[in-house]
Amino acid sequence: MSNVPKEKRFIVWLDEVTKDDVVLVGGKNANLGEMIRAGIPVPPGFAVTAYAYKYFIEKTGLKDKIYPLLNSIDVNDKKVLDETTAKIRQWIMDTPMPPEVEEEIRKYYRELAKKIGMEPEKLRVAVRSSATAEDMPEASFAGQQDTYLNVYGEDNVVYYVKRCWASLFTSRAVFYRVAQGIPHEKSLMSVTVQKMVNSRTAGVMFTLHPVTGDEKVVVIEASWGLGESVVGGKVTPDEWVVDKQTLQIVDQKIHHKTLAIVFDPKKGKNVEIRWDENKQAWVSEEGPVDIEMVKHFHPDKPALKEEEVKRLAELALLIEKHYGRHMDIEWAVDYDIPFPDNVFIVQARLETVWSVRKEKEKAEKKAEIKGKNIVKLSEAKVLVRGLPASPGIGAGVAKVIFDPHSKEAQEFKEGEVLVTKMTDPDWVPLMKKAVAIVTDEGGMTSHAAIVSRELGIPAIVGTGNATQVIKSGIEVTVDGSRGVVYEGIVEDLVKPKEEVKAEVAGVGISPEQLLPLYPVTATKIYMNLGEPDAIEKYKDLPFDGIGLMRIEFIITDWVQYHPLYLIEQGKESLFIDKLAEGIAKVAQAIYPRPVVVRFSDFKTNEYRGLKGGEKYEPEERNPMIGWRGVSRYIHPKYEPAFRLEVRAIKKVREEMGLTNVWVMFPFVRTTWELERALKIMEEEGLKRGKDFKVWAMAEVPSIVLLADKFAEYVDGFSIGSNDLTQLILGADRDSNILAEMGYFDERDPAVLAGIKMIIEKAHSKGATVSICGQAPSVYPEIVEFLVEAGIDSISVNPDAVIATRRLVASIERKIMLKRLNKIMDKLNKLELGF
């Protein structure tokens, strides 16, 4: 190592660098050095220091030319900005590098080759910028300076180091610094020179979900070849979501990857290859592709093996642990090296979006609803879907633009929706004007996604065909939280949100004041709801979802007609649309919290009360245990009406993009009826899955006895304590006499024993258990029993949400203390020799 103080050296090895050297080597290099010291597999290399760059511009006199010129211009004048920055970059490239700096770069390149055991002229390296302000927590500056891959030979390395220095003065970099309030004089440039990984697969990963901010997962994006295709948003990459605790893959999306960037050893350069669907082969503009590694690529094949996904997740957690912060990481898998040594980390930076985001959502701006084509959510046509890259709602006139320097780009107005194939840093001035952004290509960590989140602009990426489907000049609404673009201005989504106070149970405080007051509980606290409009009053209460959404109110108040009557009149759409509108109102207001919608549970006498109902409903002596629940859905006479309910659910989930809606079957008596009802759902296109849960009400004693059998058909149960008490005790819930005598009591030992049986049997099969009857809202002692029995969630009336959450937290603490005391007693006995 050199005797010259580190801060005065032109070059330092990466393994000499620590996080304290950010000023000298920039954020990227400092992070690489930190990871090497932490034992993370990082390709070897060296850093051309910021001091070398500073020495260059001072010794050559460029400093006195560059900064006065830059500080004299208006960066919002794009023409002047482009001309000025181009002139500065040319000055840098035309000015010879001081010999003492150039020779150091050549020397270290030769030494790197020697360390690796390669001939210098054959050593391929990545030459990357590492600006001293680039990785500040306040701004990610995604793609601000240049990166050059597969560079080889001393002359080329020297040339591309200068190119990196010059990239400090692109229009986009200058614009960003001004926008972030960073003085140009304080922005210096270090350069990474690092051995290239022969990338079979490359990509990015986050140690939290980049869209939702979920801290319990690692999100990995991958595609074939070099990572430039992923980072640059040129391809929609494969995606894996990995649970941090178990390292199990909890979600996986394999996309059609038709583009890759690879190094062609015969041509000695990187080439962009595309999948030819007709030839079923990879081709480039220069003809057929004859690269050994590419033979293993296929557009629909996962770009990573499961073992590689888990290895990457392990490394992500090590890096996160080392820094104590959420991280944004670039990685590559080497084609020539066997697993697990083939996985390398090539960059890591602090995650910048969720790190600085407060509770406010910039994306959801308060604005008057303006537009010619104003529609309701239930009537809105879905134009395209994509990956929800930046949350929020944006609505306005769409403009399809393919070139950020085109006439169309110059005419782009503030408040319009930008629709394009993909973005790179040249698009930033346009992006800042946009009310929302939609791209054909890219993943959640593409340039469009990163910058949109940083700017607080709703964005959807990877739609595939937005530029073809969306026409310039039409009004659209972009839902960046769900990845859906609607035609028209959807008033339900864009209307101003007023401050809503939680005036429940005597609580009259704002959501901001309320949030810190409630404790976190292991047992989920859900809320029961019947009237959709009431969600505006209650949505800011501390509940984890809607555990029971009754649709009977929507049918009686919004639809009013018997569904079979509407079918006979040819007005099925009225029923579907109204039901969908009511459900969507609730699901939209609390997204992404789940909404468990119970299919209709009218009794025959209640159905007769609907307009036109008398024709279709028999008169029963005991409707409470008569033709209700699932028995109606599978009956040939009523099945068409049940199908309307299923279609409404499907519309909410698939057309409106509200995938937080689940369903629940009421009054389930047998497994065979449940099986038949599920089959009808499947025929209508709704099938149980990872993101679509199906529950059953547990209110008939047959479920108590056979919960483990019923669990084969559903994901969870919700105990209806009212009907369950009635049927276990044989006590009519509507009988005042029996109630006064104390017969109808959910706390009866027989009822509690039945509830405990349901929980135990359901859990033995992996099903969850909730309760949505009135008991928890009325009897605190039942809540304690339920928590101790291991129930997964408790759904209560709005006025009981806060009290129940606090009660559950207290009970959970008491249970933990009991267990701790037992452990301590055992330890004490062991120490005393008992």
Curated annotation (Swiss-Prot):
Gene3D superfamilies: ATP-grasp fold, A domain (3.30.1490.20), ATP-grasp fold, B domain (3.30.470.20), Phosphoenolpyruvate-binding domains (3.20.20.60), Phosphohistidine domain (3.50.30.10). PROSITE patterns: PEP_ENZYMES_2, PEP_ENZYMES_PHOS_SITE. Its cofactor is Mg(2+). Disulfide bonds: none annotated. Substrate binds at R550, R598, E699, G720, S721, N722, D723. One of its GO terms (molecular function) is metal ion binding. Pathway: Carbohydrate biosynthesis; gluconeogenesis. Its EC number is 2.7.9.2. The N-terminus is blocked. InterPro entries: ATP_grasp_subdomain_1 (IPR013815), PEP-util_enz_mobile_dom (IPR008279), PEP_synth (IPR006319), PEP_util_AS (IPR018274), PEP_util_C (IPR000121), PEP_util_CS (IPR023151), Phosphohistidine_dom_sf (IPR036637), PPDK_AMP/ATP-bd (IPR002192). Mg(2+) binds at E699, D723. One of its GO terms (biological process) is gluconeogenesis. It comes from the Archaea. The N-terminal domain contains the ATP/Pi binding site, the central domain the pyrophosphate/phosphate carrier histidine, and the C-terminal domain the pyruvate binding site. NCBIfam families: PEP_synth, PRK06464.1. The reaction takes place in three steps, mediated by a phosphocarrier histidine residue located on the surface of the central domain. The two first partial reactions are catalyzed at an active site located on the N-terminal domain, and the third partial reaction is catalyzed at an active site located on the C-terminal domain. For catalytic turnover, the central domain swivels from the concave surface of the N-terminal domain to that of the C-terminal domain. PANTHER family: PHOSPHOENOLPYRUVATE SYNTHASE (PTHR43030:SF1). Catalyzes the phosphorylation of pyruvate to phosphoenolpyruvate. Belongs to the PEP-utilizing enzyme family. Homooligomer. Forms a large complex of about 2000 kDa. This is Probable phosphoenolpyruvate synthase. It comes from Staphylothermus marinus (strain ATCC 43588 / DSM 3639 / JCM 9404 / F1). The lineage of its organism: Archaea, Thermoproteota, Thermoprotei, Desulfurococcales, Desulfurococcaceae.
